[in-house]
Amino acid sequence: MKKRGKKPELDWETEEQEEIIWVSKSEIKRDAEELKKLGAKLVDLTKTNLDKIPLDGNLLEAVELARRSVKEAKRRQLQYIGKLLRNTDVEPIRDALDKIENKHNQQQAMLHKLELMRDELVSKGDEGLVALLIDYPQMDRRHLRNLIRSAQKEKEQNKPPKAYREIYQYLKDFIIEE
C-alpha cells in the first residue's frame, strides 16, 4: 500500500508569470483542416514539382501512396498526411509550394502581356512597332513590319489569322529568351 502524502502546494506567483496560451478546440480543428488542404495540394502536384519541395521520407511516401489511392482510401491517406504535417515544420513546404504556384501565375501574366503587345502592334501598326522597338531594339524591324501588315490584311479579308499567330510566336520566342 502506498502512502498518501500531502498535495504539493502550488506556487501561484510563478504560475502567473508563465504565459499560458489557450487554444480553442475549433482553432485546432481549423489548423488541422488547413494542413489537410496543404496535403491535398501536395498530392495534386506533378512528380517534378513534388521533388522541389522539402519533404521527409515518411511524408513523401504518404503523398505517393495517396496519389495511387482512390475514394475512401485517398481520404484516409489525406487525413494521415495532415497528421504528419502537424508534426513537421510546414513553412519551408509552404514557401516551396508558393514558389511553384507563383511561377505558373508569372508565366500566365507574361503570356497575357505578349497577347496585349501583339494586339497593340496589329491595331496601331508602325506606331506600335516604334514603341516596341524602343523597349526591344534588337528585334528584327523588317520581319515584324511584314508580319504586322500581313496580319492587318488577313483581318480585313477575314482570312485565318496565320500572321497574327506568327507575331505572337515571334514575340514569345524573343522576349522569353531575353
Curated annotation (Swiss-Prot):
A GO cellular-component term linked to this record: cytosol
One matching Pfam family: DarP
Protein keywords: Cytoplasm, Ribosome biogenesis, RNA-binding, rRNA-binding
Tagged with keyword Transmembrane helix: no
Residues annotated as transmembrane: none
Domain of life: Bacteria
Cross-referenced Gene3D superfamilies: PSPTO4464-like domains (1.10.60.30)
GO MF term set: ribosome binding; rRNA binding
Compartments reported by the entry: Cytoplasm
Any GO BP annotation: assembly of large subunit precursor of preribosome
Family to which the UniProt record says this protein belongs: Belongs to the DarP family.
NCBIfam families linked: PRK05255.1-1
Function text: Member of a network of 50S ribosomal subunit biogenesis factors which assembles along the 30S-50S interface, preventing incorrect 23S rRNA structures from forming. Promotes peptidyl transferase center (PTC) maturation.
Protein name: Dual-action ribosomal maturation protein DarP
Organism in which the protein naturally occurs: Mannheimia succiniciproducens (strain KCTC 0769BP / MBEL55E)
